[in-house]
Design a protein with these regions (language model features):
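N-terminal sensory and localization modules of signal-transduction and trafficking proteins
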Residues: 6, 10-14, 126-132, 171, ...
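Second-shell loop/turn segments in exported
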Residues: 21-23, 55-62, 101-107, 114
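Juxtamembrane extramembrane loops of integral membrane proteins
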Residues: 38, 42, 53-64, 73-79
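Short hydrophobic alpha-helical segments used for membrane anchoring or interfacial signaling
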Residues: 42, 85-93, 195-203
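Amphipathic coiled-coil signal-relay and dimerization helices
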Residues: 48-50, 89-101, 203-210
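Solvent-exposed, extracytoplasmic
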Residues: 68-76, 112, 148, 161, ...
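Extracytoplasmic/periplasmic ligand-binding sensor regions of membrane-associated signaling proteins
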Residues: 77-83, 87-175
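Juxtamembrane extracytoplasmic/periplasmic/luminal helical "stalk" adjacent to the first N-terminal
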Residues: 1-55
Length: 211
């Protein structure tokens, strides 16, 4: 019995250590997401460029696209292989033809998860974990023999308002893969037939290692 108790205690300690690691990893990654989206908000003039009421000159359009591309390059450099995708949803569609990551705000409003964005009073909010609707590459993979598996992401949203009317004129979305969020690459190996499970607030399974 003493040997059994020792094994049980070892297992409990290892489990506690692993759960602490997952919690710490998620906290650190959430802090990283907040830092990135706040930096974007600080550096970019989103209320001006995303508002459909503003007619942008060709020079302004080029400036915005170049500035966003530079920011994303900086993010990749500072946080390599950390984020899955970043998207700009705008009521101003002038830039959409020039920037592959810009989409119409009206398209976002038609999504079933748009209500979860506007329901939050804070400018920055986390969405429910869901399958990504974006490809991390602009390459068309439909006819290529590449992995097309579903990518689960935690989306984080920044609402952009008209400074006078307080109407939403745009939304910035930053996605992190759920595997990156929990730090899957560094999770301790618990042994055969043992998986890690992560549930949301509704007890819905959103992440599982192994099978």
């Amino acid at each position: 019995r003493g040997f059994q108790n020792s094994l049980l205690n070892d297992a409990q300690n290892k489990l506690k250590e692993t759960l602490n690691y997952m919690e710490t990893s998620m906290d650190m990654n959430l802090d990283t997401i907040d830092a990135v989206i706040n930096e974007l908000n600080y550096r970019q003039e989103f209320p001006y460029f995303l508002d459909e009421k503003n007619v942008l000159s060709e020079k302004e359009q080029i400036y915005f696209v170049s500035s966003m591309q530079e920011e994303l390059i900086n993010i990749r450099y500072l946080y390599p292989n950390k984020f899955y995708y970043g998207a700009v949803f705008s009521s101003n569609n002038q830039i959409k033809e020039k920037y592959e990551r810009q989409y119409s705000l009206e398209d976002l409003k038609n999504k079933p998860y748009y209500n979860e964005i506007i329901a939050e009073k804070d400018n920055i909010s986390y969405g429910m974990v869901r399958n990504s609707e974006f490809k991390s590459s602009n390459i068309n993979i439909e006819n290529l023999n590449l992995d097309k598996s579903v990518i689960q992401v935690l989306p984080t949203y920044l609402k952009v308002y008209n400074l006078s009317t307080r109407q939403i004129v745009g939304v910035i979305e930053v996605d992190m893969e759920i595997t990156k969020l929990v730090g899957e690459d560094n999770l301790p190996v618990m042994g055969n037939n043992v998986d890690y499970l992560l549930l949301d607030q509704n007890n819905k399974l959103i992440y599982q290692t192994g099978t």
